[in-house]
Amino acid sequence: GPAGPTGATGATGATGATGATGATGATGVPAGRNKIINGNFDIWQRGTSFTASGYGCDRWRSYYTGGTTTAYTRQSFTLGQTDVPNNPEYYTRLVVTSGNAAGSRASFNQKIENVKTFQGQTVTVSFWAKADATKDLTVEFLQYFGTGGSPSAYVTATPQKFSISNTWTKFTKTFSIPSITGKTLGTDNNDYIDLAFWMDAGSDYNTRVSSLGNQSGTFEFAQVQVEEGSSATDFEYKSIGETIQDCKRYYMHLLNIGGGGYATGSGQTARAYTYATFPARMRVNP
């Protein structure tokens, strides 16, 4: 597979009622258009501070290698702030220390389940970001065809590199996602399209990141949206309850599960079995 994040794939997209304030955005704009899950960074089932490469905020993974390290934390907006609209509660901070090598990299990724998503279409990414000083950032989409059998090699859309500053700024970037005509899927049902924000990338990754280069610094993100079309609509809010149900398709913290359960055992086999009903249907068996 690609030199990128691993693990459970992302989601096909949000569905259902739109929840909190501003849910549908502009008049006539459909609900469920944002294919990013937890783009408002509301749900953190695993904790709020991480240093290992991997998942932190639900559905969002920090990936680093080649001597680079990243500290990945939840941050709270000040009550009443006006820098980022609509009163979000949290944002994500990544403090990157580059390994300063050709193979060094740090990225912040979400996988969107099903590589067919957006294939052959124009999509628009919108998000708020800032850094500790002026830094470059590259946004990339990668189509991964899964494992098992003889799947096609991954394909990337043309990346976009640009500068971010030390003040919160909204960025809007439009991409042409390649067609998957003639491609072959793997048989393991783990294909996806990956959104990556690259913060550090040595020369080994030049073609994927428009020669971003090695850099260290603090990068912060809020209100990430990916939607079909060539323009960005207002950020689509969802209720906390709906968002956590979306997240639980991929990960859930099983603590004090509500509902009935039962256990059985046998003295002859010295085994015991416990059964419980999960609060959401998961993408694959846990």
Spell out what each predicted region is.
Residues 2-286:
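Extracellular and organelle-lumenal recognition/adhesion modules and their flexible linkers in secreted
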